[in-house]
Curated annotation (Swiss-Prot):
Pfam families: Ribosomal_L21p (PF00829). This is Large ribosomal subunit protein bL21. PROSITE patterns: RIBOSOMAL_L21 (PS01169). One of its GO terms (cellular component) is ribosome. GO terms for biological process: translation. Part of the 50S ribosomal subunit. Contacts protein L20. InterPro entries: bL21-like (IPR028909), bL21-like_sf (IPR036164), Ribosomal_bL21 (IPR001787), Ribosomal_bL21_CS (IPR018258). The keyword Ribonucleoprotein applies. The gene is rplU. It comes from Variovorax paradoxus (strain S110). Keywords: Ribonucleoprotein, Ribosomal protein, RNA-binding, rRNA-binding.
Length: 103
């Protein structure tokens, strides 16, 4: 069974037992969270597509860890003006273990 969930402004296709990295969620490590923003649920032979959400469908996840992605380098430059600017960014993430998919 699989589901399409929405969290952090993005959509993810998940199945039970998978591990995914999503935008940071304010939750403690080891805590169970119920995600109710489920856009679609399928089991191979049939699929339920929400308008926009599937009513009564939930996905239970467990928070495994928090961390930061690799650094992305940003370099801005204006030609002939002696202007150069360097910057970096590390996006924070939460790693989730997908549990039960209901609905």
């Amino acid at each position: 069974m699989y589901a399409v969930i929405k969290t952090g402004g993005k959509q993810y296709r998940v199945a039970s037992g998978e591990k995914i990295k999503v935008e940071q969620i304010a939750a403690d490590v080891g805590q169970e969270i119920v995600i109710d923003q489920v856009l679609a649920v399928g089991n191979g032979s049939e699929i339920k597509i929400g308008t926009p959400l599937v009513s009564g469908a939930t996905v239970t996840v467990t928070v495994l860890s928090h961390g930061k992605h690799d650094k992305v380098g940003i370099f801005k430059m204006r030609r002939r003006k002696h202007y150069q600017k360097r910057q970096g960014h590390r996006q924070q993430f939460t790693e989730l273990q997908i549990g039960a998919i209901a609905g």
